[in-house]
């Protein structure tokens, strides 16, 4: 039986102008999205910059392939990790959520800092 509190979670490895990882979390019928310049934190003690970018449609969670030259985000996209997540706490500057992925598992945080788009992404101890 599916838990109604479980939402889509996916990280897409995006080899565009600069290799990065796109963290996507289902919220309000869209995928809230953050670009993470370095490998996402599998264990606690590692903090990563996560830059919030535009929302994506839910069906983008399954996208793998090539975005053609000349289009925004041109390059290759592959699914690096996927699963479900449960939101534990949320306010304007902080999200706490449990990830149930293949690579990432456990309690994670996104905390806003230095302006509107910049967040810290890390696994809680």
Residue positions per predicted region:
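A charge-rich, low-complexity, intrinsically flexible signal that marks solvent-exposed coils, linkers
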Residues: 1-125
